[in-house]
């Protein structure tokens, strides 16, 4: 039952916490030469957790053991993946499997699109560096992976995998820390999208507490679906980094939800792990066809968003340029000697988010460029940001991306950790429509939790990047 003795986090406490994290971030900047990039990342974890605490619904009700357990598990997963050779090799094998999936998808793409889907033939026609056509090389992977996942779901293979890892995570957290439903959803989000994963717990969504709903939403925003993972890998992202950040996000989303909105009620699924068995298809063939259709709708959605958002960026940049020219004209008329800087959306994002990139452990020289990508990811979407990130990784050998230009390799890899997630403004509407359809009675709660979920999902990817920044060579 709710704790009636608590009235929420006091305004003075919030002010002190905000002041504290600003001082912490400033200190990290001034001592950057002494602490190095790993030290920056350590400060970053404290900064991001402090920001979550400052935005907490009620700090007095936070179960700090749950927070410590989740952070410890997240760090342990990062340590195992990045520092233990056997585990790292295992993730490399999984990355190779995903890459093989890309090859299978390319076979289908070449049948439909012909030479356009063949990198070598496309370069011969369009010139060196122009062989990778995003719409016919990367996006068809979504259709194929969606079909495979639909078959795995129909055969209950995906549910079994999710159940196993959810059970393990619940044992680590303890039944008092998190509920079965939110743990299942957090695990499902590693493999599935933010509107597909909740299907695993569909019967329980209507009765979830506010804290559980927030965990469900954060889990969706802190990760990407299997199909999108494959697309990012096809665009040149390191498979190990993509897989690692998705796995690390599962415990992170859970403990951040308990920090932002502490659990004060008794969840219906306390200590229980039960997967909903709802199958929409009659057989495997029907599942494959349905999955392919769903994947096609996602591909069309991605194409539409990229066209709209990238065109929108060009429009906004043009308006900002005209505004800057007008201001400089007025300044010159008045007789002042200085000139107003040429504004662009990229310039604004780089200034606003470069401190965040710095606190992830990114080198200070690269922070403005990575900060620009973080801003695009949060305000626009992850595809726009990843498309720009790909521009920094355009050298290809044997149809594979190699090398990075313009920034350090370390900064590039940390950006992958931070950008792999659905945490952007449009995801609030996507979740409101998708999860709200499963439990119409909770639509108002979902709407009220939207901005907190966005914050939690964004912080989860930043903390993932910071942990990688500590562990990465």
Where are the regions that the model predicts?
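Short, membrane-interfacial amphipathic segments enriched in basic
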Residues: 44, 87, 156-158, 274-290, ...
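Long, contiguous bundles of hydrophobic transmembrane helices that form the permeation core
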Residues: 247-298
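Structural signature of hydrophobic alpha-helical transmembrane segments
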Residues: 34-46, 137, 343-344, 416-424
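Transmembrane helical segments that form the transport core of multi-pass membrane transport proteins
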Residues: 293-402
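Hydrophobic alpha-helical hairpins/lids featuring a short glycine-rich hinge
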Residues: 94-95, 99-170
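Alpha-helical membrane segments and immediately flanking helix-loop junctions
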Residues: 170-233, 284, 371-467
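Hydrophobic core segments of alpha-helical transmembrane domains in multi-pass membrane transport
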Residues: 16-29, 45-55, 70-82, 142-151, ...
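Interfacial/capping segments of alpha-helical transmembrane domains
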Residues: 35-41, 67, 71, 75, ...
